Amino acid sequence: MVSVQLNDNESIDKMLKRFKKKYERAGVLKEFRKKAYFVKPSIDDRLKRSRGKRRAQRANEERNS
């Protein structure tokens, strides 16, 4: 669980900004979306492989640029 304390002389906007950063880094929303519905293991593996291929292609394009 992500928690943030309000520091002395800190505005609520800054505290919210810190909370949002911690929330994103913790991957709470990403995990929630991932578990929102069931994905068969075979489809999950297929998606992981396709993501890896795209990542490798982008890395290869960056090296060649």
From Swiss-Prot:
<protein>
    <recommendedName>
        <fullName>Small ribosomal subunit protein bS21</fullName>
    </recommendedName>
</protein>
<dbReference type="GO" id="GO:1990904">
    <property type="term" value="C:ribonucleoprotein complex"/>
</dbReference>
<dbReference type="GO" id="GO:0003735">
    <property type="term" value="F:structural constituent of ribosome"/>
</dbReference>
<feature type="compositionally biased region" description="Basic residues">
    <location>
        <begin position="48"/>
        <end position="57"/>
    </location>
</feature>
<comment type="similarity">
    <text>Belongs to the bacterial ribosomal protein bS21 family.</text>
</comment>
<dbReference type="GO" id="GO:0006412">
    <property type="term" value="P:translation"/>
</dbReference>
<dbReference type="InterPro" id="IPR038380">
    <property type="entry name" value="Ribosomal_bS21_sf"/>
</dbReference>
<feature type="region of interest" description="Disordered">
    <location>
        <begin position="44"/>
        <end position="65"/>
    </location>
</feature>
<keyword id="KW-0687">Ribonucleoprotein</keyword>
<dbReference type="GO" id="GO:0005840">
    <property type="term" value="C:ribosome"/>
</dbReference>
<dbReference type="Pfam" id="PF01165">
    <property type="entry name" value="Ribosomal_S21"/>
</dbReference>
<dbReference type="InterPro" id="IPR001911">
    <property type="entry name" value="Ribosomal_bS21"/>
</dbReference>
<keyword id="KW-0689">Ribosomal protein</keyword>
